[in-house]
Amino acid sequence: MERSGTARQPQLLGQKKDKFWLTVGLCALTAALFFLPFYIIEGGFFHYAGDFNSQQISFYRYMNGFIKGAGYPDSAFTSVHNTFSWATDLGSGVMNAYSFYLYGSPFFWFSLLFPQGWLPYLMVPLLVLKFAVAGGGAYLYLRRYVKNIDYAVLGACLYTFSGFTVYNVFFNHFVDVVALFPYLLWSLDEALYNDRRSWFAFWVAVNLVNNYFFFIGQVVFLAIYFICKLSTRDFRLTAKKFGLLAFESLLGAAMGSILLVPAMLSILQNPRTIDLSSGWGFLTYSKVQQYLAILVSWIMPPDSPYLTSIWSEGVIKWTSMSAYLPLCSLAGAVAYWKAKRGDSKKRIVGTCAVFALVPILNSAFYALNSSYYARWYYMPVLVLAAMTVNALENHNTDLDSPARGISWLMIATVAFAVVPVQDSDTGSWSFGVLKNPGQYCAVLGFGLLGLLLYRYLCQKWRSDSRFAQRMTAAVLAFAFLFSVVHIGIGKFGQWYTDSDLVKQDTNALLLKNDLPEGDYRVDTYKIHDNIGMWLDKSCLQYFGSTAAPSILSFYPALGVKRDVRSEPELSNYALRGLLSVEYLITTPEKQTDLENEADDGWEYAFAKDGYAVYRNTNYVPMGFAYDYYLTQTEYEETAKATRANLLMRALVLTDEDAAVYGKYLTHLPEGRREELYYESYVQDCRERRATAASVFQMNNSGFHAEITLEKENLVFFSVPYDDGFTAYINGQEADIVEVDEGLMAVLCPAGENSIDFVYQPDGIRLSRPLTLGGIVVWLAYTAYFVWRKRRTKRA
């Protein structure tokens, strides 16, 4: 006999129609309403804070044009097009740089229907679409677990407007994952309970292509989900069912591998992996506050991503740490937990709670990434939504006592506001350890107000036939109010720094057409992130996590921090000559600061389009030769502070490459490794400029250069090394040498040389046929089951 709250065949139970589109519409309308005030205030160009402003708007606008062929021209040497982005840091393969952000997102590809110039104004409509899609998917999943379809609508709204989703508007592309995941879980249920074929493979592929990084966590969660349901005998597992499920899993992975294989090969070169040096780091977090923050994140509305209300220690900011359900918190889920025994949902959520509290298990959702994140919470949130609506639908469940208990837990956090604190320097006493009291009061107020309204509705309307509808209305109203406040806190908290964002971005589009012609890099000074993307220029200041991995070794070797952004300080003047920076851009308001801080190598060029532009008098065109080299071992023995100066004088070769290519250069004498001053840097730039290529042309698949050499020599290009590059010298393929711990050089003969570097993502030759083959197999597989179903019906 079927137990209440377990899976069942989706039924309409005599109702006139399904409510999928109603759910989609409600979620879209609510999202549109809470974005509307900001949309109106800003004239349609919605900007938020942090990553949304610096990355998401810039990435969507830039990539819309890049895919359509705007910007750098096609290469005349090859038929390969649109594979390499010069505006991404020092230059990066576009597939690997953006597959984490948007390259596989169906929402991004949908945005290509619109002109590039529209994209900054379409960020809100696209977010509304994502919320709508999330609601539809959650409804499809949840309707299996309810008797009254209205509770599926309610559960879908709880999931769609959870604290996790609203929090991650800040990151934008995380909402894509929230939107698509319910369809994956729905398709798994369809395969397990209804023996429905092909849908699971399809949604595996879609979720994998959408975001390979989040897909790793989805695989872990699906394993937990499957095992927990199997352990409670929610479905009957046969060898045939398991075999078909395994086949569809592999088939979906094959169809989605178009981005996966290149991304994995790129990630293997990325140093942001788990630190295996600490056994305790596997099992415990280093700060007690981390545990408290995790527990509170499941019951209280979230803080703004970059502001913490309480916590002063631990990794809290930007981690997406929230599993809060709007209005209800965990009240309904706890009520369900108390009422059920041996239930699969309880086991799923319980297992996820253990994973959240153990570092090594938590990091399993991110391929053992060493950085702490909670960006997988959206998956148990969907199960929590199911538990909540099951508890609300069952009139025998005690709803009030869990709500009271959670209210008291929320109130207990007031202790952080009143605990006495003694100043270690002055000895004076004060009260409270709150970091942002105003935000804390707002979060606590919404949490308590939500539970108060939840209890009122349950007490007054629970026996009413329209209880689910009333609760849905209350949840949506609460979600609207909280989302406006949450986004407002984050947005206006940075208003003093971001109020001129739109002006700078739009002015950069004007400046793009007024900059001198040529293929060179630029630098910026005290202006907003990623302006280089609006200029379509390679820029030393870049904010993005997934640029070419070799950049993450090149910069640290120079003492320049490179985690999620590149921002070498202006004082590192030699880096500008090495990387062929010709112009530096700032605003008129910052000119005085720039001139006081900069070295003598910058001269004022012109002011236009709201910017002041300076020219680098030590500019060296890209593509030049050296007289000297030193080994990487010798290089690593030098002071990091002057290594950029050293790189203008000598090429750095690995010990192995020095044995092969050292004969074309002179080993740098020890005495010349120390004369590293500004004056000697100017002379080194002059010497490198004398050997520079006469032609250097950037294109959307790499670059073309022409150079005349007096003797056979290595020609250096300050382009990040990547296994996806193939070099051609005078039409003949040539070996690429990794130099300077992350850049490239190629050996050219004496005389005139035509050099072409062509980029295709490493692994694409494997992933492309794998994906195409997978699609062909899936179409045949689907066609077979459609044919069999029709034949059965006719029989």
Say what each PLM segment does:
Residues 5, 10, 14-16, 665-795:
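Active-site-proximal, structured, solvent-exposed surfaces of multi-pass membrane proteins
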Residues 194-195, 214, 345-506, 752-795:
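Contiguous transmembrane helix-bundle modules in multi-pass membrane proteins
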Residues 113, 471-713, 717-725, 730-735:
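Soluble catalytic regions of membrane-associated enzymes that act on cell-envelope
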Residues 37-145, 150-182, 206-210, 293, ...:
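Active-site lumenal/periplasmic loops and adjacent helix-entry segments of GT-C-fold
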Residues 234-243, 333-356:
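Membrane-interface helix-loop-helix junctions at transmembrane boundaries of multi-pass membrane enzymes
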Residues 53-57, 61-76, 106, 241-242, ...:
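Periplasmic/ER-lumenal interhelical loops and adjacent helix-loop junctions
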Residues 1-40, 244, 452, 466-476, ...:
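Start-transfer (signal-anchor) and selected internal transmembrane alpha helices
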Residues 27, 131-144, 150-231, 244-264, ...:
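Membrane-embedded helix bundles of polyisoprenyl
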